[in-house]
């Protein structure tokens, strides 16, 4: 591929063997049925390839993985005491993952740790992910996403579907595509149709955003949480550009918005919109629940908004920031 030699993988045993060569180049030669992993390791299932260790990139997957358009189905991981869980537990900045679909997976990571980082495809990503997707169920405690748990790299032309669950009653920073998108993280032309359930900082695409979300990224799934719940992003500290949400957003608490639950002081929203139906208690808005940042450049909301408490608005529930050239 591209003049480089790749190891061809045609079965789930060879897929697991990537753990012994984290710097290698791999390609799928066929679709892989990974259903047998449900009986592996005394019920713990597949062992994630690579992990994240601070200042030790060699512990992560550093190579290349090209699915060549093939799928991996019924992958099973049940590791409720393990951080950095996914097909790939951790990837370094040099890693490349592309052209692969993970379908009907059942992925469970740490159910009590604040650094759990659980994703269908990658738990902790510093590399590049493109033209890839994940469907099925993903469950964890903190930083949980349908495709990636914690993103420090690039995600483009990718999507997630299925169900993403933050541990019931306690699961925070939960997103349909990505749990937390960090400062260096970039998401473009990607989307989620996932149903998302969590407690705080819950979003249809991203639970908490410190990076960039742009180029027609969107969410259509239903989102349910308690605090800082948004159709696209739960809590936004950075840039959302040319993006939208359409799913139903429901919160049992405050800071709930069709697009963003809480837009922080550094948060900017431009050329983005929501047609979501929004239901909450306090600080409920068609676009943003509570705004401390900037909403600009033809951003709008067009959904039905219902709040049972105070600060309920068609565009923003409560505004202490800048709103210009935007409407509902």
Predicted regions and their residues:
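Surface-exposed repetitive/solenoidal architectures
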Residues: 1-328
